[in-house]
């Protein structure tokens, strides 16, 4: 990938800013997401809650199923590959997917190395729970970062923790002297140019979304107020009592995240939220994958 192409990919990801990206399992769900105002959909055979419940090895979704979703909607379609599985990424690029998510939700294919994202033309999304992880993924060619949260739980606590951690570390970098940035880059194991960008601009060089545990409009607005530039919603919509209404409400919450009156209004009568799992009741499986 050329430098110009990478800049284009980062700009493509910027176009999703202020939007909601929803996990969908079939064309019908994709159409519901599009009608609700989703900025993009994530095509996958099993949503995180089902992956967690079933256990075993989880892999890239069937390309035929992804293509059916691509044909059903006009908004961008994303799909997940396993961490380090560059052949799954090659397959998704071959079917002209709009974005690839190198995701800790699936079972890692490589426990040491991530995909070299600069070998691809398509933009990549990656998860991160702190500034070091985020900048390492960006150094590999990621065009978009999201918090990891703990997918499939409906518990927002980890996404909040990751976003706050990233914000704190960004502020720490901003407070360093210019000549201290080289040591910071060494500690974070990233090129100094990325640390210099954070120092100067007070944010990541790419768009930063929230993901993991978003189940209500209030959750989505919370992440936006903490500094997220958009929200991924996985199990929270289609594991709820009224997916159509909840999808629309979460989109409105992201748009109006600083307006409590609107948030109160759209939070009414949504039906039952997905059954959540407290982080103290489970083993943290996914958020720790891929550092």
Swiss-Prot record:
| Catalysed reaction, written as an equation | aldehydo-D-ribose 5-phosphate + D-glyceraldehyde 3-phosphate + L-glutamine = pyridoxal 5'-phosphate + L-glutamate + phosphate + 3 H2O + H(+)
Checking Gene3D superfamilies in the record gives: Aldolase class I (3.20.20.70)
GO molecular function, a single term: amine-lyase activity
- Name one matching Pfam family: SOR_SNZ
The active site consists of: 80 (schiff-base intermediate with d-ribose 5-phosphate)
Q: Which family does it belong to?
A: Belongs to the PdxS/SNZ family.
Q: Which PANTHER family match?
A: PYRIDOXAL 5'-PHOSPHATE SYNTHASE SUBUNIT SNZ1-RELATED
What name appears for this protein in its UniProt entry? Pyridoxal 5'-phosphate synthase subunit PdxS
The organism encoding this protein is: Streptococcus pneumoniae (strain ATCC BAA-255 / R6)
Gene name per UniProt? pdxS
